[in-house]
């Protein structure tokens, strides 16, 4: 290989984060869908960020054909810097202004399946992490959150179903055998949560009433011929909606919630606001062919993507280094959901054992190898490689540590504060930790928060060594704990972790003994943390 043909690899560092120089308050998109040439009209309400020095507006793009750029309805000068569209002659001050961009793209040639693509007669999108820039020019970063309106136009016979995020405002026919559908998402979201689906699809529908008395429409869309395999998926979606409302007080916030299942989706599942897109593996099942594992996978993944509605969508990540903020928290929530759905204590235990077995098999080996990285990494070269067992599964165990330290009620108080304080914002793992501590100010977590947050910054699997001794004369038991953590790439010396430990003593007859701690507290379960 000729070394001159190698593209230099750039590294993005967490410490280099800077807030955007502009905010995009609202987005109005119009699509004229065509497999060979889709036309996209992008109207944005933009304003400068007063906290950042004045600079040009630099919009991300990739593989687009640019036709027109207007600012406040007038033509304007622009330049291209690589794939980026740069606008310099913009209104000054803090008043919002309108930017209108007209582009075209070729969905049928999009073999990367990022952005808008065409497969077997249908249009689909995949925008996380940086796919939206392949649809139109935009600030393709998670901390830019906007409200969205989307107008879809297409041939009615070939694409009778037109879906996007949020609530359906209106639909109707157009000349020449075309039709349209207009959608509105009133809740601010980043562009990675945008979704569009168009094609020949059929739906299983179910109307539900929330605890608050609001009616919602649940829909599971599939290709014709697969509708009879969607019954369990609909049951799982209904159970997810009911569970999140009962367990965490988090209700469905849109008039409808849609799932689209297609074999042409290579991301497993994606939590686009109100319009989840799944691979058929996690939706379709029939008793005659599906295994218990298939059913569990459907229930778990549908729960996971639905739970993102609040932990990931309504509150999202400031930057991609905070990915575990949404994924670790939501994996924890889907694990709790699966345990609650299991019913009996023994079935719950089986679920937990399965989770830990998977953690030991996949994440422990990742932590022990050359690719070891913290739950909140410090740098990356390719964002698509960021979706790891450490970020997801270990991240979920870090969230479980909060619940262990605070108890179920204390954790709920922390999550309630997190939702109320940060709804509609793009935040960090530190923000989540602070909410947990602020909601439980007298807790061990609050008193040692900086130590606890080492779980986010240090890689590796710590080892806990325990030794105990019983003094019959004084009827006292002493438990000594030591911890260690092996070196990992870039981290040779590890500071102690905050590790909650559940313990208890049993009498000869197997009954639990009360523990009289030296500090005077009497508890059935004690926590001890020490470093050595």
Where is each model-derived feature located?
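Beta-strand-rich binding/interaction modules
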Residues: 65-71, 445-450, 461-532
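Aromatic/His-enriched, Gly/Pro-containing loop or helix-boundary segments
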Residues: 56, 73-93, 126-135, 223, ...
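Intrinsic-disorder/low-complexity, polar/charged segments enriched in Ser/Thr/Lys/Arg/Asp/Glu/Gln
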Residues: 26-28, 37-43, 56, 84, ...
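Hydrophobic alpha-helical and helix-loop surface patches within well-folded domains
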Residues: 183, 214-469, 479
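Surface-exposed beta-strand/loop patches in extracellular or lumenal glycoproteins
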Residues: 41, 45-63, 137-140, 146-155, ...
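N-terminal, polar/Ser/Thr-rich
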Residues: 1-39, 117-126, 138, 142, ...
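Extended, low-hydrophobicity, Ser/Thr/Pro/Gly-biased non-transmembrane segments
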Residues: 102-205
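A surface-exposed beta-strand-loop module
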Residues: 49-119, 176-177, 532
